[in-house]
Amino acid sequence: MQIALFQPDIPQNTGTILRLCACLDVAAHIIEPAGFATSDRTFRRAGMDYLDQVRLTRHDSWSKFEQWRRGLGHRLLLFTTKGAGSYLDYAYKPADILLFGRESMGVTDEVLAAADARLVIPIKPGLRSLNVAMAAAMAIGEALRQTGPAAKFA
């Protein structure tokens, strides 16, 4: 199981998600361009000393990420407010990549079209969306509940 962030623009959210990935032994991907540098103080504070523990790959562009992903044959599951099905009703596989869009705009039409599934976390009508770090935690929790953790923890 892996988490990918498409052009993230809020450093605190990205740091929090990378900390989550480190704690759960889940690989992480940042698809550039990000809206901040990894030296950003708020990014480092949110990730704390866990950033050195995460298996992080930075991809220079969407096309390079997509070439890498297709080469391995991994499914791409996009979490979006425009999802076609609930994330709770989906059957996850251990090699899936859970993709989250940019906080300010989501993903491009090209990314939307490339997704093998578009999933939504149902929320109360009239509200826009969850914080992306909270959405990532909920999504990876359900995916790992179904598939089991990547590593056995004591």
Could you describe each region identified by the protein language model?
Residues 1-154:
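Post-transcriptional modification and biogenesis factors for structured RNAs
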